[in-house]
Amino acid sequence: MTNIRKKHPLLKIINNSLIDLPTPPNISSLWNFGSLLGACLTIQIITGLFLAMHYTADTTTAFSSVAHICRDVNYGWTIRYLHANGASMFFLCLFIHVGRGLYYGSFTLLETWNVGIILLFSVMATAFMGYVLPWGQMSFWGATVITNLLSAIPYVGTDLVEWIWGGFSVSKATLTRFFALHFILPFIISALVMIHLLFLHETGSNNPLGMPSNSDKIPFHPYYTTKDFLGLLLLILLLMTTALFYPDLLGDPDNYTPANPLNTPPHIKPEWYFLFAYAILRSIPNKLGGVLALILSILILMIIPFLQPNKQQTMTFRPLSQFLFWILVADLLTLTWIGGQPVEDPFINIGQMASMLYFFLMIFIMPTSCLIENKMLKW
């Protein structure tokens, strides 16, 4: 008798995606981050649902409702800090996941890669809107500054900003629509994740060698389910340690002050995971130029597959490309640091140099290194 998981219409899909999925035998722990991102999304949806039960999307009561969640709701503080720090874990896993894709040449799986970039944009939009909801000082001014960037778009910019605000400034209408969008987007992200996996399972996973592994595959369960479970335990350990011992480590103290449109904080800055893009935005003195650079800093990932002329898929056997990849990582860490600093010398110059290096590495230096390596290998 054939197993029910192989016959039942619904269980068959789950079986082919999570149990009997043919997987390369040599994928490393860096391939764990896909499942960890799924876990992060689940944690965010569950904690977010409980927070939404007690939160009120109104400018007069939003801040108080968050305080009420932390003080009066059973384990409300735990749920709130798990949600806030869960977002940080989400982005940490996202950045490693994208970095692994760049290092091992997973961008050659075009459909999977492009859906992944759309997912990245969606998660960034969701996180930004979530940061506005507590209605603290940094929430209000972050929303004002970032949405106001759209006014740089010629002709329609000002109208677009007022349309997003629902008025002539960030107000109750803005908060209400941000809450509605913040609630619905994770479910849209879940649907995109399904499409991401659908495209991935069409081609099969890449592996550290970049070699075809069709002749040598192993089932996903039990080998990679146990491996993923270990990664999940480590993620939960890190999340719990942060949420329970250092809940405000990654937050901004200004957000414990209720939003005041008459008082601007000395340094307006987003959460740590947006600082690299914020530094690129600030490094260009022109408003429209800054906005374009900000969008291109992520959108550039879409053209990476067309900029890489390498004959070997992964960087495993390409020392020059490896060296440049780690320079790129160091550059992004520098940009993250600069994004959190005030706009004054020497930070302005460092930010401009780091931003230039980021785009030069992506567009010119790394593709050139690929050509040099091809030449050295006589390919």
UniProtKB/Swiss-Prot annotation:
The record lists heme b b562 as bound by 83, 182
Q: Which residues bind heme b b566?
A: 97, 196
Gene3D superfamilies attached here? Answer: Cytochrome Bc1 Complex, Chain C (1.20.810.10)
Return the InterPro entries for the record.
Cyt_b/b6_C (IPR005798), Cyt_b/b6_C_sf (IPR036150), Cyt_b/b6_N (IPR005797), Cytb/b6-like_sf (IPR027387), Cytochrome_b (IPR030689), Cytochrome_b_C_euk/bac (IPR048260), Cytochrome_b_N_euk/bac (IPR048259), Di-haem_cyt_TM (IPR016174)
Stored PROSITE patterns: CYTB_CTER (PS51003), CYTB_NTER (PS51002)
Q: Which GO terms describe its molecular function?
A: metal ion binding; ubiquinol-cytochrome-c reductase activity
Q: How is the cofactor bound?
A: Binds 2 heme b groups non-covalently.
Which biological process, per GO, is one annotated for this protein? mitochondrial electron transport, ubiquinol to cytochrome c
Cofactor(s) for this UniProt protein: heme b
Give the location in the cell. Mitochondrion inner membrane
Alphabetical keyword list: Electron transport, Heme, Iron, Membrane, Metal-binding, Mitochondrion, Mitochondrion inner membrane, Respiratory chain, Transmembrane, Transmembrane helix, Transport, Ubiquinone
Q: How would you describe this protein's topology in the membrane?
A: Multi-pass membrane protein
Q: Where does a ubiquinone bind?
A: 201
Q: Name one GO cellular component term.
A: mitochondrial inner membrane
Transmembrane segments annotated in the record for this chain = 33-53, 77-98, 113-133, 178-198, 226-246, 288-308, 320-340, 347-367
Per its database record, what is this protein's job?
Component of the ubiquinol-cytochrome c reductase complex (complex III or cytochrome b-c1 complex) that is part of the mitochondrial respiratory chain. The b-c1 complex mediates electron transfer from ubiquinol to cytochrome c. Contributes to the generation of a proton gradient across the mitochondrial membrane that is then used for ATP synthesis.
**What interactions and quaternary structure are annotated?**
The cytochrome bc1 complex contains 11 subunits: 3 respiratory subunits (MT-CYB, CYC1 and UQCRFS1), 2 core proteins (UQCRC1 and UQCRC2) and 6 low-molecular weight proteins (UQCRH/QCR6, UQCRB/QCR7, UQCRQ/QCR8, UQCR10/QCR9, UQCR11/QCR10 and a cleavage product of UQCRFS1). This cytochrome bc1 complex then forms a dimer.
Q: Identify the PANTHER family for this entry.
A: CYTOCHROME B
Family per similarity comment: Belongs to the cytochrome b family.
The miscellaneous remark of the record is: Heme 1 (or BL or b562) is low-potential and absorbs at about 562 nm, and heme 2 (or BH or b566) is high-potential and absorbs at about 566 nm.
> What is the protein named?
Cytochrome b
Whose protein is this, by species? Lepilemur ankaranensis (Ankarana sportive lemur)
